[in-house]
């Protein structure tokens, strides 16, 4: 897999969300996490939602706690939000936003809902299975084809405005399998580190 820590996000925030992302992303990167999304909403008063993950795509409660403790003081100093807010740190979840090229590679074969900023084959919204990914675009096999449409569509990464995995049984199975493999790899790494210390 490519070095995802250096890989830019394809879909980024605007306005105050962008300012918050600029403040916290270096902190997350320094801790070995990737920023997925920042969203400030009026939910439950005012809520600042930060989605992040490890480079291997996993995230646990302890990771969320560590991130919260690291970014809270930075946000307090920079003070980008004028009102009081609740900080909520979470994983992207199984039906996650797709924000990096590696997300499309990692989840190839799964259903995704996509919106573009420009017309692609006379549409801005697509739904289908990711069947191919290259440096500049990805190919979707549409799950619903309108009259006169091709069964596949190539969507350029630079046209993306939103993309999200669609929850299916296959996605749940593969996400759980990937999480289990990542945890096993981390445990093996810890065992090797402990053996080196002896």
From Swiss-Prot:
Its main location: cytoplasm. GO terms for cellular component: cytosol. It comes from the Bacteria. InterPro entries: Ribosome_maturation_RimP (IPR003728), RimP_C (IPR028998), RimP_C_sf (IPR036847), RimP_N (IPR028989), RimP_N_sf (IPR035956). Keywords: Cytoplasm, Ribosome biogenesis. The keyword Cytoplasm applies. It is found in: Cytoplasm. The keyword Cytoplasm applies. GO terms for biological process: ribosomal small subunit assembly; translation. It holds the Pfam family RimP_N. Belongs to the RimP family. Required for maturation of 30S ribosomal subunits. NCBIfam families: PRK00092.2-5 (NF000932). This is Ribosome maturation factor RimP. It comes from Agrobacterium fabrum (strain C58 / ATCC 33970). The lineage of its organism: Bacteria, Pseudomonadati, Pseudomonadota, Alphaproteobacteria, Hyphomicrobiales. The gene is rimP.
């Amino acid at each position: 897999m490519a070095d995802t820590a250096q890989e830019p996000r394809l879909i980024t925030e605007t306005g105050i969300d962008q300012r918050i992302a600029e403040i916290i992303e270096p902190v997350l990167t320094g801790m070995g996490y990737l920023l997925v999304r920042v969203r400030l909403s009026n939910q439950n008063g005012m809520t600042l939602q930060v989605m992040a993950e490890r480079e291997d795509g996993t995230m646990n409660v302890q990771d969320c706690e560590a991130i919260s403790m690291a970014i809270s003081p930075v946000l307090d100093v920079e003070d980008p939000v004028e009102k009081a807010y609740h900080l909520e740190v979470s994983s992207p979840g199984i039906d996650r936003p797709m924000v990096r090229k590696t997300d499309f590679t990692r989840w190839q074969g799964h259903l995704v809902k996509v919106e573009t900023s420009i017309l692609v084959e006379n549409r801005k919204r697509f739904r289908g299975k990711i069947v191919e990914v290259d440096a500049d675009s990805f190919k979707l096999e549409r799950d619903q084809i309108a009259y006169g449409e091709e069964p596949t569509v190539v969507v350029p990464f630079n046209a993306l405005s939103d993309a999200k995995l669609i929850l299916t049984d296959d996605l749940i199975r593969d996400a759980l399998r990937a999480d289990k493999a990542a945890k096993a790899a981390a445990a093996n790494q810890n065992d090797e580190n402990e053996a080196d210390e002896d």
